[in-house]
């Protein structure tokens, strides 16, 4: 839940797709058509198409190229500041909040975004690399159903992707490090539905977000409320100003009518005009972790007025 949840569009559209001379529509059509023709998983076929396209254009899918691309990912409004605010809100009440990523995007890109240090663990697709550091095969493919395995890993405190034994061992509910009832899952659409339903049905909360700059983007999420798959629907604007103006009210649960064209976010103008990346670039220095001074803002009236934080706290964290 990174693309469309914390950042608009798909991360492959920033640098890779323009670099191979394809439009966003062409690349995703080819990948999905391959999946249909071969009756294959769409995540695996998009990863395979990346390798095929790079080879055909003489590009090198180096880890460093993905990392460089991650440093240029554009986030939704307020995302950078969100973590400090919600962490401070929890700390003021003796609650430690942990953040995880569970995404069908590329881990190599996500791990170099400016908010990567905020996450305890990033579960996402990744490649195997040869001795020269060039991607040659998918290592992890995270689709809409196997995303749920990572929810169980988080629940049981299993952080390794490789480990398949501990996650299947029986652990009493009250002894699990992260109980389902304490989980809040934030996602943007169909690839998150199984996880949203799992978390909600297990006593946690699921929140669906949409790109506020895409017309009628909210409408296709109304069915999630109707079908009792999510607890809350709101725009993907994490800024404090937005919250204070009331955009994250409980009223946002109420349904509208109509529909939204599928894949609207995929062709978002936010990602269509990026410059192609040279896939032989060198890695840049890593980001320093931000020091969060939670004590100074525990009693901040702006935080107390933050409607979305209040929603999460009053409807979830208080009901354990």
Stretches with model-predicted labels:
Residues 314-319:
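Short, intrinsically disordered C-terminal tails of secreted or membrane-associated proteins
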